[in-house]
Structures are given as C-alpha cells and as structure tokens.
Amino acid sequence: MSTDADSSEEPAGRVKISDVARHVGVSIALVSLALNDKGRVSEKTRDRIRAAAKELGYEPSKAAASLRTGRSHRIGFLLAANVERDWSEQWYSMTSQLLMDVVNVSTRLGFSVIVLPNNPAKNSIAELDGLVVSDSLTTDKSIATATALGVPVMTNERPDDSMVAVNVDSGYRAMTRAALDHLRERGAKHPALLTEPLGLHSNELAEKEYLTWCAEFGLEPVVARGRHDRSDLSERIDELLETDCDAIYSFYEEGAEIQEHIRSRGLRVPDDISLVAAAPYSDDINREAGVSTTVYHPDQMVDAPLTALVDVIEGRVTPPVTVHTPWEFVIHRSS
C-alpha cells in the first residue's frame, strides 16, 4: 500500500494517521472522516478512533485542520498528467468524456465540479467535499493529501489502498485471468502479456494478475511493455515473437493490427499464436477481424461510483466502498 499519506503529512518520528488506522483495524479514509467529523461513522467507531488517536499521541496537522471547514458542495476532478506528450490526443479525448460524465452526474446530485491540475495545492483540495482521480499515477500524492484533509476520494483499480473511499473495479484483474484461462484451455502452454508502461495503477494491477497466474502454473512470465502512443507496437510484438510464447494477451486494443503484424511474420493465428485483446467498448474492427476481446466499459465508471462518493460525503455510506463495473469476454477465431 502506498505510504504517501505518512510522508506528506507527518514529520519523521511523529505518530501518523496510518498508525491510528492500523491500531483500530480500519481504513485510513475512515480514520480521517472520524477525526474530521465527516461521513457516516458510528459513534462507537468514532469513539474508538478518537481514543486510539489520544492513546497513541496522534496530532493532526494544524495546517490541514485550519484548511478544512464546512461543506462546499464541490467535487474536484484531477486532471492527470499526460505520461507521454505525443499521446495527448487520445489521452485528452478519454479525459474529456470522463469529465463530461462527472459534471453531468455531479450536477444531478447537487454538486459543482472543480477541475484541478496535476499535484494541486493543498488549499485547493481542502475546499472540496470529494475528489475524483481517474487512472491515477503511482507517483501521485493528491490522494494522500486529500485523505489527510478528510476529503474522500474516488478512483479506480486501487483495491487494497485504505486511503481510497470509493474504488472502481473495472474488471482489469478478472479480464486478465479470464483471458489467460481461456488461452490455456485452448491449448496455449506459454501465454505472454503485451502491455503499457508501468506507472498507472490500472496497468500494474493487470500485470500483477498475469504474474500471479504464471506463478500458479509454474510458468516464466513473458512481458513486453510498449509506449502509450503505440509508436513501438510492432517492435514489442516482434519482441514477444522471438520468445517461446504461443499466445498473447494484449492490453492494447488494436487487436486487428496486432493480428496482421503476426501474420506478416509468416505465423498463423490461432494455429501458431493465439490472440486476445482488451478493449474499451465493443470494437467493430476487432470483431470483423475475428479477434477475441475482453471488453470493459469506461462509460460505466462514473454514475454509480460518483453516487457512492456522494453517499460517503453525506454520511449515508461508510467507506471503503467498491463499485464493480461490467465487462464481458467476446470470443472469436483468433483464440
């Protein structure tokens, strides 16, 4: 679990909010809400947390406490940093659609939306009732800052992070395992993973599931990581084809392009190499090319999760909350 909350809010040697959470056996998010008199926390639990904080000698940051006052009916949307500038068109297209969905749902629920830059100032976060962070970078400290200020956070693919009030499970782990199990059932003995760079929690979660799966079957992992902008996709496919892999699960949605490149190397799909690609939404190009696809739904990542975040803000639900969004496995002739 990330320890950014500890390093960003408390000097070395002082009792940290994570120490209180560990002592009571609850999440950091719940401790933060209890100590800031926010959210739905039973009096019994709130008393236990306060007693533990007193017993351990925990002293909240005075600066943070002075920043956090009342309700603003504002939800922050963190504009994540573009990890590769030449991928900006696709990155901002995805972000823009997500922002529109956040604005529409927030308005319906009686909240306005404030767009924040990457790594915003603490006082900007303190003015919010909640924070939405999409596909967070592993280096981002905003979630830790928000939690320390008592601002509940909604993000995705961080299932074991106690700083997150609402986690959206888009199916990355389940899709990865389903694809690998399917490839094995169809005769593949050594599936490889074609994925994007480390640094995004979603990518790392899927890769971790692949590594776990390989360990379960005693297989040596074969992973190729390409750029977000796809500029080295051909090279990464060739990298995998030089190994002994007989199947590929790709987190690049360009399944048809990958299949065509494999065939250009004189290999048959699926006879020599089986292929499954992950893609947002149902993909006509992959379907027409006969590429098996695990399909996830970014359009489902806002309504129910943001409603849950507002429930946390208004005390109707106790964090942490996990919202599962749908996914499906569409099998075609490539596997």
Map each language-model feature to its residues.
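An alpha-beta-alpha
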Residues: 177-217, 321-334
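Flexible loop/turn connectors
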Residues: 238-335
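Short beta-strand elements in bilobed, periplasmic/extracellular small-molecule ligand-binding domains
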Residues: 102-117, 192-193, 207-232
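N-terminal helix-turn-helix DNA-binding module of bacterial transcription factors
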Residues: 1-73
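Flexible loop/hinge segments that line or gate small-molecule binding clefts
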Residues: 137-178, 279-291
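Hydrophobic alpha-helical segments within soluble ligand-binding/sensing domains
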Residues: 167-193, 230-238, 295-314
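Short beta-strand segments enriched in small/hydrophobic residues
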Residues: 30-32, 67-87, 130, 182, ...
